[in-house]
Each structure stands twice: as structure tokens, then as C-alpha cells.
Amino acid sequence: MRLNSLRPAAGSRPDANRVGRGAGTGNGKTAGRGHKGQHSRSGGFTKVGFEGGQMPLQRRVPKVGFRSRKALTRAEVRLSELNKVEGDTVDLLTLKQAGIINRGVRTAKVIASGKVERAVTVQGLAVTKGAREAIEAAGGKVEA
């Protein structure tokens, strides 16, 4: 066996469909393009989304909302999620290590949702008034 004698397995590569080569082939004369019209011509195509001059769907439907790029760098943390953090101090780094917030987050805010079950020290995070009261009631403290 040599490289120049390698052949694909029989039947694994079907022959290309040769159009316009006689009526007996089933693709002769019009070559599968039908009669007349834009699509029968060479270069005959329409842009994606083109609806023949009618106002296309993409332009008929109103624009709605947007995705804030600030949301990618900010996060909200529930009080109940503070229990998942190991250790007594909670800051941006420990929240990331616990898998509570994403890597790209730069600022986080603790909101009053759920309960804190142990005393924790919150450092460098924004805290709502209700969350601050709950943390202090559990014996913890909030540091700027």
C-alpha cells in the first residue's frame, strides 16, 4: 500500500450531482432551478431578512430594553448566602472563593433576604439598612 494508491471506501463518497447534463438525469435543462424568476438567474439571491420590499419583521417590531454593562461588574448578595462563606470575615474575595459571585464582579451589595446564622464581619461591601440591622443583631459588624 502506498499513499498514491489510497482510495476512500466504496460508497462512502457519493458523486457530485452534475446539473444541466441532459433530461435523463432529472436535473437537465433548467438544472433544478425552475423556470424564470430571480432564483433561476445567476447571482439571483435575496438578503437574509428581505421580504420583497415589505417592511421586514426585524424593523416592524419595536425596540425593547437593553443589557446594562454595569450589571456585569455588580452583584447583590443575600444575607442567607453569607452563611456559605468560610471564616468570620466576608469581603469581595471570600465571596468569589465561595462561588457566590462571579470573577468579574467589582462591587457587591448585601441585601436583607434570609437570615444570618452566625456573627460575621462584612468588609468593603455596600449594605442595605435592613441587612445592617440583621448582621448586627446576629452579633456581627459592618466595616466600610
Swiss-Prot record:
GO molecular function terms listed in the Swiss-Prot or TrEMBL record: rRNA binding; structural constituent of ribosome
UniProtKB keywords: Ribonucleoprotein, Ribosomal protein, RNA-binding, rRNA-binding
Region (Disordered): 1-60
SUPFAM superfamilies, alphabetized: Ribosomal proteins L15p and L18e
Pfam families, A to Z: Ribosomal_L27A (PF00828)
Keyword Ligase (UniProt): no
Gly residues composition-biased segments: 21-31
GO biological process: translation
Family label: Belongs to the universal ribosomal protein uL15 family.
Biological role stated in the UniProt entry: Binds to the 23S rRNA.
Name of the featured protein: Large ribosomal subunit protein uL15
Gene that encodes the chain: rplO
